[in-house]
């Protein structure tokens, strides 16, 4: 028997079947670095329209986690897809380098500033530590396949950036948004510093819940308001609180002007509380017998005075919109030094903003004899005992509730009035302008707009000062006596900024005021405060984007971070940009959800359900991690587990196998010499290119809309359905058995070439390593990297007016599916071993029959059978099976006639008819020794 294997055009490629990504990717990365791939892309894109995704800086502390990976991969997908869409999209990664977490790490090793090291040496240690953290994180980000200017990232501790942060504050001061005041701010007694809203987390805490009686200073005045002539015992206004320690700072009791308040007689005393809460309060107090003596609106009780239960003064009843009926008594204990609502209402009524608590959380001397020097969280029991002793405690119980805590220490925090510097939301219309700017931004998902609007509408003034060592100095001088800013404050800040640009923030601490103040140095002192780190990152639109040459003065198009950043970076950036420039710093804001495990639980080391990106890359490769990110809907929680990553790896294999099939069958194809013009191609090949064109239209729209999971789904559908289960199956016969240089085969290769050129680009933003690998195996001259080009423009499709248009082939797909069902049943019944052992008769209604007949003898190639006939539906044989999908079709199957050709595996009656090739069929003889078969349709 002759061996005809050498006469076949068998697929051949060096592109490996197995990705082996964990081993192969590092070598590709080394090549990208050696070649300066990022620089090559920038050069190729120079002069194109820009798209700037400004990197929100991660904090330079600790290893990257799965959330970091999601964030950086999403950014990289966007930057790469924008590049392919014809944009110049530079990506400058950044790091947030100042602040308390770094201070705490350095303290743990070296002690607090002033112990073993001077403050200057301590700052140097902080800078060193941050630099090492940046290096560690950078390696992992690069390993993810993220392309960017990793050699020149921006760091908030770069001298120039530090200087520009000071300049940003100067601009805000110049625009009139800064003010100083003693305001209640989130205060961590462990940090001994004010906290930003974004540094506050909420945890459950058990606190005493108490009802306290404030006796009326003038009982007759109260009785007159309620229209009663006598009561049994003293009259008291009842407040409810879960923070007894704040009672020394009480300066008023707030009522709602429109609520009804009742005067309730119980045994031996009369109590004032909201009428709607009387029943619940009486149950709490255990008062079964009570009488409502009268009711009045809260507004009627305004400015009546009540005696503080243990301090030696009276406090007024005042009116506020913050009073609710959700819990308590409808009368709110008001301490302007310990709460933002209390402060606002206190300002309205001219109340003292009392703060009896020191920075360490202990009461200051002179607060109250039994409280002086006591930590506030240990004082609750003392205050409760004091109230009981004074006869003012009506009820006490334990209550578990959500309580604000420091995100670093996980310990409860307090509101504490301290002298701080604030960016005012209202004194120059910052709130109003910010809300206006929000409407001009595209929020993705769109619910982000309502979220940040609500936050801006309700947020307090932004406390930007901190009492820390490692941070950008506020660089202000204030008068020794009046504490007013120096009249040349902005000019002086520029002088400081110039010095910081040369020597870093230490230049401020080393500065002798006389050097820039001259004679004024005797009257003015340096403000020791540093800036909130959210000011550092929030001003990068000015300190980085506005000054980096690659951004060429363009504002950022997009900010992209986790959904917690509405109150973090998105907020601080919006506040600073609007205060500086009157406009938002971004055009689009995209947020992604948090990562959870396969059961939807939050990632936690204690549960043991964390997924390490380093482990995933070392085991499966970065492209699998990237494919998981892209295939997950980032608008909600993003579930990840070993099983979910295994599914991503399965999807990857399907895509890789498709690419390998394309490359293997392009063996020997030169696009310059062998390309077949569209009009001369086999119709099925043109259809396949049209499928790629339709897929590309969908994929490009999905990239444009940042719907990456849609990109992956469409890519998978193309590989699995249109290619894998139809086209690639059909063309194997023609590709392998036709004459190597025939139009029939070159037409097929031309289609595969067009498809591969498009496919590799669709993959590039997501599976970057694999796309780069494929690119190296594609035939023809090309740029060195797929990332420097644009979406493939060589695709085309069938004309709608053609007889064999897309609709025609869609129907053929259905027919083939119905034929496959019959063949599968015959295989199960052992009637045939494979589809080429079968011949089918298609009994079809006239319209469908005409479509099938149009293919002539090539119908069998579409159906992957050795024989195929078309007959009248009405003449269907008894064994013909009715199609469930196509009512006008019945399919009958029989064993194919003739012998199996060992070369093409088709069964045919002309095997051995040519003496020189007595073992093979006539078609194969023609393809080996003759002119070769002609294909027109399939």
Swiss-Prot record:
GO molecular function: aminoacyl-tRNA deacylase activity; ATP binding; isoleucine-tRNA ligase activity; tRNA binding; zinc ion binding
InterPro entries for the chain: aa-tRNA-synth_I_CS, aa-tRNA-synth_Ia, Anticodon_Ile_BEm, Ile-tRNA-ligase, Ile-tRNA-ligase_type1, Ile-tRNA_ligase, M/V/L/I-tRNA-synth_anticd-bd, Rossmann-like_a/b/a_fold
Pfam family, one: Anticodon_1
Motif 'KMSKS' region boundaries: 602-606
EC number of the protein: 6.1.1.5
Entry binding sites for Zn(2+): 901, 904, 921, 924
One GO cellular component, as annotated: cytosol
GO BP field: isoleucyl-tRNA aminoacylation
Cofactor note: Binds 1 zinc ion per subunit.
Motif 'HIGH' region per record, residues: 58-68
Protein residues bound to ATP: 605
Transmembrane regions listed in the UniProt entry: none
Reaction catalysed by this enzyme: tRNA(Ile) + L-isoleucine + ATP = L-isoleucyl-tRNA(Ile) + AMP + diphosphate
Protein location: Cytoplasm
Keyword Metal-binding annotated: yes
Residues that coordinate or bind L-isoleucyl-5'-AMP: 561
Group of enzyme by EC: ligase
Gene3D superfamilies: 1.10.730.20, HUPs, Valyl/Leucyl/Isoleucyl-tRNA synthetase, editing domain
Keywords: Aminoacyl-tRNA synthetase, ATP-binding, Cytoplasm, Ligase, Metal-binding, Nucleotide-binding, Protein biosynthesis, Zinc
Family listed: Belongs to the class-I aminoacyl-tRNA synthetase family. IleS type 1 subfamily.
Annotated HAMAP family: Ile_tRNA_synth_type1
Swiss-Prot/TrEMBL domain comment: IleRS has two distinct active sites: one for aminoacylation and one for editing. The misactivated valine is translocated from the active site to the editing site, which sterically excludes the correctly activated isoleucine. The single editing site contains two valyl binding pockets, one specific for each substrate (Val-AMP or Val-tRNA(Ile)).
Subunit structure: Monomer.
Full protein name: Isoleucine--tRNA ligase
The species this protein was found in: Citrobacter koseri (strain ATCC BAA-895 / CDC 4225-83 / SGSC4696)
């Amino acid at each position: 028997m002759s061996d005809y294997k050498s006469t076949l055009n068998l697929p051949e490629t060096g592109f490996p079947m197995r990705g082996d990504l964990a081993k192969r990717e590092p070598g590709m990365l080394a090549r990208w670095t050696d070649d300066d791939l990022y620089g090559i892309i920038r050069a190729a894109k120079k002069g194109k329209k820009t798209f700037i995704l400004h990197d929100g800086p991660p904090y330079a502390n600790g290893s990257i986690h799965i959330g970091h990976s999601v964030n950086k991969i999403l950014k990289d997908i966007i930057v790469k897809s924008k590049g392919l869409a014809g944009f110049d999209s530079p990506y400058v990664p950044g790091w947030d380098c100042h602040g308390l977490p770094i201070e705490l790490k350095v303290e743990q090793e070296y002690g607090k500033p002033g112990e073993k090291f001077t403050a200057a040496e301590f700052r140097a240690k902080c800078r060193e530590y941050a630099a090492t953290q940046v290096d560690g994180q950078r390696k992992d980000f690069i390993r993810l396949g993220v392309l960017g200017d990793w050699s020149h990232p921006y760091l908030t501790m770069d001298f120039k950036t530090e200087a520009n942060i000071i300049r940003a504050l100067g601009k805000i001061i110049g625009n009139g948004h800064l003010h100083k005041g003693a305001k209640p701010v989130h205060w961590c007694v462990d940090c001994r510093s004010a906290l930003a809203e974004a540094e506050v987390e909420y945890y459950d805490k058990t606190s005493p819940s108490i009802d306290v009686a404030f006796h009326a200073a003038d009982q007759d005045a109260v009785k007159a308001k309620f229209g009663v002539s006598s009561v049994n015992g003293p009259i008291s206004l009842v407040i409810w609180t879960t923070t007894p320690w704040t009672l020394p700072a009480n300066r008023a009791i707030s009522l709602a002007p429109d609520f009804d308040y009742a005067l309730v007689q119980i045994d031996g005393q009369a109590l004032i509380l909201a009428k709607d809460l009387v029943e619940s309060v009486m149950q709490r107090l255990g008062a079964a017998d009570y009488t409502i003596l009268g009711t009045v609106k809260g507004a009627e009780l305004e400015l009546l005075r009540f005696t503080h239960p243990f301090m030696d003064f009276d406090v007024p009843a005042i009116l506020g919109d913050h009073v609710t009926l959700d819990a308590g008594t409808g009368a709110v204990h008001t301490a302007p030094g310990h709460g933002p609502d209390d402060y606002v209402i206190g300002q309205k009524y001219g109340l003292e903003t009392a703060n009896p608590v020191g920075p360490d959380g202990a009461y200051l001397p002179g607060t109250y004899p039994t409280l002086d020097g006591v930590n506030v969280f240990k004082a609750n029991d003392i205050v409760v005992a004091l109230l009981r002793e004074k006869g003012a405690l009506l009820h006490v119980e334990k209550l578990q509730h959500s309580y604000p805590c420091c995100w670093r220490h996980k310990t409860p925090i307090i509101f504490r009035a301290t002298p701080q510097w604030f960016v005012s939301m209202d004194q120059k219309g910052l709130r109003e302008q910010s809300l206006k700017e929000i409407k001009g931004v595209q929020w993705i998902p769109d619910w982000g707009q309502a979220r940040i609007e609500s936050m801006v509408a309700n947020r307090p003034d932004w406390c930007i000062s901190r009492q820390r060592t490692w941070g950008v100095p506020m660089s202000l001088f204030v008068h020794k006596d009046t504490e007013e800013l120096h009249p040349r404050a902005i000019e002086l800040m520029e002088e400081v900024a110039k010095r910081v640009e040369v020597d870093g923030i230490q230049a401020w601490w080393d500065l002798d005021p006389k050097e820039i103040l001259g004679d004024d140095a005797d009257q003015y002192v340096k403000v020791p405060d540093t800036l909130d780190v959210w000011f550092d990152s929030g001003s990068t639109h000015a300190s980085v984007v506005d000054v980096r040459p690659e951004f060429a003065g363009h504002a950022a198009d997009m900010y992209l971070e986790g959904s917690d950043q509405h109150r973090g970076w998105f907020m601080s950036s919006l506040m600073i940009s609007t205060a500086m420039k009157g406009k938002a710093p971004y055009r689009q804001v995209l947020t992604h959800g948090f990562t959870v495990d396969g059961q939807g639980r939050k990632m936690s080391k204690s549960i043991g359900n964390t997924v390490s990106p380093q482990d995933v890359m070392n085991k499966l490769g970065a492209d699998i991690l990237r494919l998981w990110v892209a295939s997950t809907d980032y608008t909600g929680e993003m579930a990840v587990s070993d099983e979910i990553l295994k599914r991503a790896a399965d999807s990857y294999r399907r895509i890789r196998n498709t690419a390998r099939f394309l490359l293997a069958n392009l063996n020997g194809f030169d696009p310059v010499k062998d390309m077949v013009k569209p009009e001369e191609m086999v119709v099925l090949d043109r259809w396949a290119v049209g499928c790629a064109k339709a897929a590309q239209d969908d994929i490009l729209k999905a990239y444009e809309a940042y719907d990456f999971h849609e990109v992956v789904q469409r890519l998978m559908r193309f590989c699995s359905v249109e290619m894998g289960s139809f086209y690639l199956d059909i063309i194997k016969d023609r590709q392998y058995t036709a004459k190597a240089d025939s139009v029939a085969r070159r037409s097929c290769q031309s289609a595969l070439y067009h498809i591969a050129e498009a496919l590799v680009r669709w993959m590039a933003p997501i599976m970057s390593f694999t796309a780069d690998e494929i690119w190296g195996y594609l035939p023809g001259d090309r740029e060195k990297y797929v990332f420097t080009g644009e979406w493939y423009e060589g695709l085309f499709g069938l004309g709608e007016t053609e007889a064999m248009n897309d609709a025609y082939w869609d129907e053929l797909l259905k027919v083939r599916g119905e034929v496959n069902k019959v063949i599968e049943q015959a295989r199960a019944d052992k009637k045939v071993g494979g589809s080429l052992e079968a011949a089918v008769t298609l009994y079809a209604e006239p319209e469908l029959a005409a479509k099938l007949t149009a293919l002539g003898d090539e119908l069998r190639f579409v159906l992957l059978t050795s024989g195929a006939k078309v007959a009248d539906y009405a003449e269907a044989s008894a064994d013909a099976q009715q199609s469930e999908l196509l009512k006008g079709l019945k399919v009958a199957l029989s064993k194919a006639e003739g012998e199996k050709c060992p070369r093409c595996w088709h069964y045919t009656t002309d095997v051995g008819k040519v003496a020189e090739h007595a073992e093979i069929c006539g078609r194969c003889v023609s393809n080996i020794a003759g002119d070769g078969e002609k294909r027109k349709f399939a």
